[in-house]
């Protein structure tokens, strides 16, 4: 009985230390596609990317003036 309790204690210590080494949220970032990241990243981006099995929660950057097509400006020039 003491050996079983000791074995469980050692497993508990090992599991806690390995999660601390890898990081607290290690498993939350692992993914296969963007759907796996949706719950974790929903507060930052509506459809996150899964790059190399890791969730990318960075929001898309806003387009610069060079990236905006001219048709977007022509509709506002009538005012």
From Swiss-Prot:
GO cellular component: extracellular region
Swiss-Prot/TrEMBL keywords: Antimicrobial, Disulfide bond, Fungicide, Plant defense, Secreted, Signal
Signal peptide: 1-19
Location(s) in or outside the cell: Secreted
Primary location group: secreted
Domain of life from the UniProt record: Eukaryota
Disulfides per UniProt: 31-50, 37-55, 41-57
One BP term from GO: defense response to fungus
Family: Belongs to the DEFL family.
Name of the featured protein: Putative defensin-like protein 309
Organism encoding this protein: Arabidopsis thaliana
